[in-house]
Amino acid sequence: MTGFFPTEYGLYFTTVIMSIGFHYFEAVKQSLSLQWLKKEEAPQILGRLIAIGSVTSLTVYSLLWFFIEVFQASFLINFLVSGGICLGLAIFMGMYFPSFEEKSQQNKSIVLRKRYWLYYLLTFLSGARRQIFVVFAAFLMVEKFGYSVSEVTLLFLVNYAFNWLFAEKIGQLIGRIGERRALTLEYTGLIFVFVAYGLVENATLAACLYVIDHMFFALAIGIKTYFQKIADPADMASSAGVSFTINHIAAVVIPAALGLVWLWSHALVFYFGAMFALLSLIASQLIPRDPMRGNETNLTSANSLGYQA
């Protein structure tokens, strides 16, 4: 469909449709993953899913390059072929998987619980940091260091390759050391990375920071597995939607606000990122050694009845 609307407003229209579908898919994927996976295997399997997604991205990038460079395929043809494949897969999935098994009946209404407050906070801060990386780190590569489209694409490919090779191992690490230690490692590393972004003057070093930055984000699996351990099984579907909404509060506000800061100081934008990482580090220390219902944070006791809230 996108290939038939090669205009500015056509791109806006098709992007909104794509965004609706993407976020619906991501919410369903998170909900089903946390419902179906056992708690002890969830970190590794979630890491494996990231690795599979990265392999798929590498494959699609390679095919697009092949069609464009070898066959000189137009944008219209590329979009038609890609859309046709996606439509075919959707029809196949609808025929062979007409419904999904629910291990527990899911709440059909929006669920907000006081005992999930730490999860909500970590999700919000994660969204803020993520937007600084997605929007401004790539922008830094182009504006300050003059990276070309092909060079930025190469960075994307390196990131996908890293996830392919190591995401499952990172999931295993989270399962072994626990969510608090894993998130502590992530946020400590991100503080240094964001500060380095603000100071870097070398293009190669900036590219290394970009890859390291992406590497640390794989540890964010720990937020999902922390929630799986403390949540009522009936809340998985509703809370997936809530978490995406909370995450995107930052996604709407941060790029606009820090875009104004960017015009004045590139470095200050990344220092804000370091501040968000520091706040995340502080918040992550409230995750108990063994999180569970009734023991959601270090501020609650394991035998508390607060999980009813």
Predicted region positions:
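Hydrophobic core of transmembrane alpha-helices in multi-pass small-molecule transporters
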Residues: Y9-F25, T204-A218
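Transmembrane alpha-helix termini and helix-breaking/packing motifs in multi-pass membrane transporters
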Residues: T2-G3, S57-N78, A138-F139, E143, ...
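Helix-to-loop junctions at the C-terminal end of transmembrane segments
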Residues: I68, F166-E179, W262-L263
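Cytoplasmic helix-loop-helix junction between adjacent transmembrane helices
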Residues: V16-I52
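C-terminal membrane-cytosol helix-exit motif in multi-pass small-molecule transporters
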Residues: L64, G83-E102, S280-P288
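C-terminal ends and interior cores of transmembrane alpha-helices
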Residues: M1-T7, T188-E201, Q285
